[in-house]
A protein has these predicted regions:
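Interfaces and regulatory segments of ATP-dependent nucleotide/adenylate/phosphodiester-chemistry enzymes
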Residues: 1-21, 134-135, 141-147
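Catalytic cores of nucleic-acid endonucleases
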Residues: 55-115
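A short acidic/basic microdomain associated with nuclease active sites
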Residues: 16-42
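Polybasic (Lys/Arg-rich)
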Residues: 117-147
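Short conserved micro-motifs at the rims of enzyme active sites and ligand-binding pockets
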Residues: 1, 52, 61-64, 125-129
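Flexible loop/turn segments at secondary-structure boundaries
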Residues: 34-37, 57-60, 121-125
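Active-site-proximal structural scaffolding
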Residues: 4, 8, 32-33, 44, ...
Length: 147
């Protein structure tokens, strides 16, 4: 919880508020509405940045063993898993999809920019973005025209 409070609710939000301070910029968080993503930025009533912040860490054992399968499992569980039952929560890409669908239902012709901000430095490795892009393309395929 400390990671969530500091990274999501303080550090990232402070940065976003300093970057998007024009009078036409609107910033919303989960505190405004539990259905919001971590941060939702509406700019000029047309451009929407849907931001999910992830402060999860890869287990040291996975990194120490250089386990590709363990790393892939971490990526899927942390950034690309759909809730399967009550009490569970969508993760990463599925959270973005939910927000994109909610915005599409409003039917205002938004230009949507989905963003995942992460703190885990091992996600900077080559191939991670390609893996997540492929997952995202598969999950969001029918909604791709929105952004």
């Amino acid at each position: 919880m400390i990671g969530k409070q500091f990274i999501e609710e303080y550090l990232t939000l402070q940065l976003v508020q300093h970057l998007f301070h024009h009078r036409h910029d609107r910033i919303f968080t989960e505190k405004d509405n539990p259905d919001n993503p971590d941060i939702l930025i509406m700019q000029n009533k047309r451009d929407v940045f849907v931001i999910e912040v992830k402060s999860s860490k890869v287990h040291a054992k996975v990194l120490g063993e250089a386990s590709a399968e363990g790393f892939r499992e971490f990526l899927e569980q942390s950034l690309a898993s759909e809730k399967k039952g009550p009490g569970e929560k969508n993760k990463g890409i599925y959270q973005l999809r939910k927000q994109i669908n909610a915005l599409k239902e409003k039917g205002r012709g938004y230009r949507i920019f989905p963003v995942i901000i992460y703190t885990e430095s091992s996600l900077d490795m080559p191939g991670v973005n390609s893996f997540l892009d492929e997952k995202f393309d598969h999950i969001i395929d029918e909604d791709r025209g929105s952004f």
